[in-house]
Each structure stands twice: as C-alpha cells, then as structure tokens.
UniProtKB/Swiss-Prot annotation:
CDD domains: PoNe_Nuclease. GO terms for molecular function: nucleic acid binding. Belongs to the UPF0102 family. SUPFAM superfamilies: Restriction endonuclease-like. Gene3D superfamilies: 3.40.1350.10. This is UPF0102 protein Rpic_3463. InterPro entries: Restrct_endonuc-II-like, tRNA_endonuc-like_dom_sf, UPF0102_YraN-like.
C-alpha cells in the first residue's frame, strides 16, 4: 500500500480557492485567508448569514489516494484540531472586539468531490 501523495503548495492553494468559491456561493463572506500565528494557521475565516465566525480547514487529496487512507476529512486529526483551535483563539484575541458565535468547519476535497462538514469539531478537541 502506498502512502497518499503529498499535496503541493499549488494544489493546496487551488483547493482553498475552490473551497472559498463554494462557501461564497452558499452565502458565507470571507473575513480572512491564511491567518497565521505562532500556534498554527487557519485556511479561511468566514462569516455566515447569522453573523457567526466560521473557521474553515480545507483538506484536499488527489483522487487516487483518497479511499485507501480515509480521504481528506480523516486527515484533520485531534492534534490538527488543537492547532486550529489555538489559531482561532489568537485570531479572536487580535482581530475581534466582541466575540460572536463561532464554529469550526471542514471542507474536504477528494478529487472532484467537495464535502462541507459544518461544526466538524468543538473546542474540547
């Protein structure tokens, strides 16, 4: 069994572009892209129609490697979730005066397929 092919920076950026268009078409507005801090990075920070901040992790996999290794969604491990939560806390502390409702979503791109997992994990991860 071969390991999944590594995702290049270009593939990752293309996946993020695709995820952004997908979410915007569903009414979300971009707040920030590729927010980086010492604790980690958030691919997309969006605001939904109700005003909640949505921290989005985009995971892309090439089609031929997805099924054997659990697909893109399976790559958001508990350790990755903790890094995303730390980055979100940093974002909120630096960028937001009044903290709105927040959630963590995952966009999994497996080849041509996009899956949007709303509220994929919480801060107790």
């Amino acid at each position: 069994m071969h390991a999944p092919q590594p995702i290049t920076a270009a593939t990752g950026e293309a996946g993020e572009d695709r995820a952004l268009r997908y979410l915007q078409a569903r009414g979300l507005a971009v707040v920030s892209r590729n927010y980086r801090c010492k604790g980690g990075e958030i691919d997309l920070v969006m605001r939904d129609a109700a005003g909640a901040l949505v921290f989005v992790e985009v995971r892309a996999r090439v089609a031929r490697s997805t099924q054997r290794f659990g697909g893109a969604a399976a790559s958001v491990t508990p350790a990755k979730q903790r890094r995303l939560i730390a980055a979100a806390e940093d974002f909120l502390a630096r960028q937001v005066e009044d903290v709105p409702a927040c959630r963590f979503d995952v966009i999994a791109i497996d080849g041509a397929r996009i899956e949007w997992m709303r509220d994929a994990f919480g801060v107790d991860a």
